[in-house]
Amino acid sequence: MTTSIIERIDAWAEKTPDFPCYEYAGTRLSYKELKRQSDAFGSFLLNTLNSDKEKPIIVYGHMSPLMLIAFLGTIKSGRAYVPVDVSMPVERIEQIKKAADPALFICTEELPSNLTITGCPVLTQDQLMDALEKHFEEVPDPAECVKNDDNYYIIYTSGSTGNPKGVQISQNNLVSFSNWILQDFSLRQGLRFLNQAPFSFDLSVMDLYPSLLSGGTLVPLDKTITANMKDLYREIPAQNFDVWVSTPSFADLCLLDDNFNQENNPNLTRFLFCGEVLAKKTASELLDRFPDAVIYNTYGPTEATVAVTQVKVTRELIDAYPSLPLGVIKPDMRLHIVDQETGEILPEGEKGEIILIGASVSKGYLNEPEKTDQVFFDYKGYQAYHTGDSGVIKDGYLFFQGRLDFQIKLHGYRIELEDIENNLKKVSYIQNCAIIPKMKDEKVDMLVAQVIPSSHDFEKEYQLSAAIKNELKEFMPAYMIPRKWIYKTEFPLTMNGKIDRKALNSEVNK
């Protein structure tokens, strides 16, 4: 059982010093080098920054070994890190920087030319490399390291106001998650883990820390590979994965290739899914193609440290239910289904809100006490969280029944529809709008924008759509931009004068 994340990772530098903790495209980082360089960086931070450890450190980059070094070095200096991926639009990065109020902004890659960081020190990639060289062989005092209920990382998720919220995950939260994953999923030493998700997305925690804690190798498929289907299909068998961690949507993409099977990936014997609904069709096809593999379906919000339920998906399970269960709760957590209005705990078989209680639950949102109090609460001495997810328990399994609000999962990203709508309303060509998720195979397939446009000079609707998307990409991530656009002169309204979203939903999901 792990009690200190850093101690256990550093121990591999003694046990298997030359074994790669990271390997991709000719770049290889050993456990010995990971310890040595993260020690150097932790020493640099302790020598450079003041003693106030409440402020986190932003680490900007994309799935590189330098990010791992920066993460662990930051932890060794006693501070939490905030991962920010290069794919984020400039405006989003500025929002996160403002909300996090960091002690330092670290660049493991060059910043976009139109982004200027003000209000905190910036460490460029060259300065980072100089710091690693200057403090080489220095070892930070272990007493300075993040411990217990100290924040370990802070991941920013979509917020209903259009501003992201920083979810604080402590060392205790991460220890609880990691011990559960390593034990319940039988992850032995030295396995090769797929890293599909950028580090700014909490699904990445499901491969990053189980890999490092078990003496495994993290093997990323970065955006240059995943953006090109031919490259992706060529790269997967070449990387010789043992453990597959991804969203179901990414697996669906890979299943389009007939060569994605056990014969071409003989070591691939574990699939771990999180981030969105796993459709029966996807699970069934994976069982057909990978007869030696075990498939796990998991569930959990960012606010409860990645995942808190799991179930092994078998043929019998697929045949037994209309949709796949999310599984059973991890041992140090409790789960209740409650009536949304009264808060009363509901019996098995009745649908209500999923409430999570226990060791995995975050302390709340960074610098956002009001938003924290809205969804986090104390339950008999334990931290608890209102997920906003609707669920039901049948035969001891949790089943997902959709969102209680306008929050959805698309390709593993958690998105608040209000966030998109608020951003769309900034566009000069839009007077009013509503975002409707288009469903397919029990999950969100794409986002449809229903728009009342402002006056414009475009002759064709596709020209208007192109102009809107061109404005949107300046301040909204690509995964949040709707794929389909429907233009209207007015919206249907409910009795109380609100947009009739049920009517719009019926139109989109006929």
UniProtKB/Swiss-Prot annotation:
Residues in the signal sequence: none
Pathway in which this enzyme or protein is active: Cell wall biogenesis; lipoteichoic acid biosynthesis
Subcellular location: Cytoplasm
Keywords, alphabetical: ATP-binding, Cytoplasm, Ligase, Nucleotide-binding
SUPFAM superfamilies: Acetyl-CoA synthetase-like (SSF56801)
Matching PROSITE patterns: AMP_BINDING
Binding site for D-alanine: 202, 306, 498
Catalytic activity from the UniProt record: holo-[D-alanyl-carrier protein] + D-alanine + ATP = D-alanyl-[D-alanyl-carrier protein] + AMP + diphosphate
Binding site for ATP: 157-158, 297-302, 389, 498
Main location: cytoplasm
Gene3D superfamilies in alphabetical order: 3.30.300.30, N-terminal domain of ligase-like (3.40.50.12780)
A biological-process GO annotation: lipoteichoic acid biosynthetic process
GO terms under cellular component: cytoplasm
A molecular-function term among this protein's GO annotations: ATP binding
Matching InterPro entries: AA_adenyl_dom, AMP-bd_C, AMP-bd_C_sf, AMP-binding_CS, AMP-dep_synth/lig_dom, ANL_N_sf, DltA, DltA-like
This enzyme's EC code(s): 6.2.1.54
A Pfam entry, by short name: AMP-binding_C
Family: Belongs to the ATP-dependent AMP-binding enzyme family. DltA subfamily.
Purpose: Catalyzes the first step in the D-alanylation of lipoteichoic acid (LTA), the activation of D-alanine and its transfer onto the D-alanyl carrier protein (Dcp) DltC. In an ATP-dependent two-step reaction, forms a high energy D-alanyl-AMP intermediate, followed by transfer of the D-alanyl residue as a thiol ester to the phosphopantheinyl prosthetic group of the Dcp. D-alanylation of LTA plays an important role in modulating the properties of the cell wall in Gram-positive bacteria, influencing the net charge of the cell wall.
Xref: HAMAP family: DltA (MF_00593)
Protein name in UniProt: D-alanine--D-alanyl carrier protein ligase
Encoding gene (name): dltA
